[in-house]
Amino acid sequence: MKPAFEDMNLQIPAVTAEPEDYTGEDGLLYCGKCRTPKEAYFPADKATLFGRDRHPAECDCQRAQRMEREAAEQQRKHRDKVEELKRRGFTDPAMREWTFANDNGRNPQMKTARFYVEHWEDMKAGNIGYLLWGSVGTGKSYLAGCIANALMEQEISVKMTNFAAVLNDLAASFEGRNEYISKLCRYPLLILDDFGMERGTEYGLEQVYNVIDSRYRSEKPLIVTTNLSLDELNNPPDTAHKRIYDRVTEMCTPVCCSGVNFRREKAQEKMERLKKLMND
C-alpha cells in the first residue's frame, strides 16, 4: 500500500511550461508574458507531506483569464435567469419592451416608477404598492412594465397580468383555484393591469375579490393600473365592488397618470406615415 503522501503527490498537477516561460532566480517557473510566477513553494511541513517542494500557482495572465471566464459564466446565468423570469412573469411578449431604456421621456410619472425600483427593498418591507390611475392611453401599463422589467433584471420575480387572463386561467386550471391564487401570491410583486375592465358577473367579481384579498393577506406589494377615476373607486356602485375597491385603495398609493394620449398620438403618427407612403 502506498503512503498517503504519495497519493497526495499524484493529485497535484504539474505546471505546463510554455516556450516563452523561464526559471527565475528563486528557482520557480515564471510566465514569459506577465513575468509573474506560475509556481509557489510549499512551507517546509507541507513539502514533507506532499513529497515535493512546490505547487502550481496562477500567474497574472491565468488569473485574468479565469476571472474573465467566471464573469462570462455569471453573465450567462444572469441572462438565463432573467429570460426565465420574463417568460413566466409576462402574459404578453410586448411587455418585454416596456423599459426605462425605451422610454421617450415624456411621461412625467416615470420618475415615480424609477423611485419604486430604486427603493424596492423599502417598498417590499412596507408592503407598498401603486395604483396607477388615469384615462386611456396615458402610459399606465408602460409605467408598470418598466417597474417589472427593471426588477426582473435584478433577478426579482414579478408577475404582470390582468384579470381577463386570470379568470381564463382559473377556468382552465387543473390545479384548483386555491393553488392558482397561492402561486400568484408567492410572487414578490404582483401587477394587475387594466383593473376594472374584467367581466362584471357575480362569478367574475368573486374571483377578483379572492385574488385581491389573498394578495392583501400575503402582505406583499401590489401594483394596479386602471382607467377608473379615484372618484369611481371611492364611490363603488354596489357592495361587491366596494369590498374590492376598498382593498385596492388600502394596499396601493394612488399615482395619477394624465396628459398626452400616447396611443392616439401613435395612431396619428402611423396615419401620417401611411399618407406619406401613398403620396410618394
Language model segments and positions:
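A short, basic N-terminal segment
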Residues: 1-104, 265-280
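Walker A/P-loop nucleotide-binding motif
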Residues: 124-144
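Residue-level preference for the first positions of well-ordered beta-strands
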Residues: 127-131, 158, 189, 221
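Active-site donor-binding loop signature of nucleotide-sugar glycosyltransferases
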Residues: 61, 105, 163, 257-259
